[in-house]
């Protein structure tokens, strides 16, 4: 697979390469071929974690591998998908077009509004589509290919939501910048939160959600389980409000 990606990235324009990656993922996903790959266990679990009327926010929607699955499920709900990179945003707009209950936002979320530098890493001749990330201005001076992206204030956006059931966040090390500003809104809205956490922030996040009455959970051998700090399987973290725990466990593990 790696050699194929390297060849495609070498011979195709970036937009075509991204289209191939996107279409290839959903073909393999829908055929069930990715079920045995632990990297995609939350993708297959999404339909069991959501209901048709849920309001979902996808922070760092990327190529839409989660966004499209969310949109398929929440037919009577609402999806807000945030993606600041122009090439990725274009691909997202195509695959989410059939879903009128989605709102695609061409921006990142951050602690404050503004413009920040972002990079898309190319490693060993392959564009790492899952690793674009915001960098500092000092780091930007040492990168040849930097994109300036729009950032909206996360707290301001969340404060406008009357209802929120689920948040997915994958923003490659920038997650604490966002969530450290959201305690008041998370307390008000009480969504389930699925988040990829950089190792250096695990302790802060666990304490943060514990303080708000959330329970740390994860997926282990196909089941939803309670976790404590480092997880049994490397994957996203799932934080569930204590008052929703019994219902989610009963629904997921039946």
Show which residues each predicted segment covers.
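Phosphate/nucleotide-binding beta-alpha loop and adjacent structural elements of enzyme active sites
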Residues: 1-254
């Amino acid at each position: 697979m790696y050699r194929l990606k390297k060849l495609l990235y070498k011979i195709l324009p970036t937009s075509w390469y991204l289209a191939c990656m996107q279409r290839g993922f959903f073909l393999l996903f829908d055929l069930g071929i990715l079920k045995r790959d632990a990297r995609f266990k939350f993708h297959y679990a999404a339909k069991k974690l959501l209901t048709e009327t849920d309001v979902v926010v996808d922070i760092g929607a990327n190529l839409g591998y989660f966004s499209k699955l969310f949109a398929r499920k929440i037919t009577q709900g609402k999806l807000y998908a945030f993606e600041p990179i122009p090439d990725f945003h274009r691909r997202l707009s195509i695959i989410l077009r059939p879903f009128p209950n989605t709102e695609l936002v061409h921006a990142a979320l951050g602690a404050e509004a503004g413009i920040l530098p972002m990079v898309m890493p190319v490693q060993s001749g392959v564009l790492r589509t899952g690793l674009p990330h915001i960098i500092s201005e000092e780091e930007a001076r040492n990168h040849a290919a930097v994109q300036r992206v729009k950032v909206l204030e996360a707290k301001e956006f969340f404060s406008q939501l009357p209802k929120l059931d689920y948040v997915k966040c994958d923003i490659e090390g920038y997650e604490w910048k966002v969530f450290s500003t959201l305690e008041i809104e998370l307390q008000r809205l009480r969504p389930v939160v699925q988040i990829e956490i950089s190792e250096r922030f695990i302790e802060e996040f666990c304490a943060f959600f514990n303080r708000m009455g959330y329970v740390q959970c994860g997926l282990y051998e196909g089941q939803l389980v309670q976790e404590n700090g480092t997880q049994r399987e490397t994957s996203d973290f799932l934080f569930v409000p204590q008052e929703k725990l019994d219902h989610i466990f009963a629904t997921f593990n039946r």
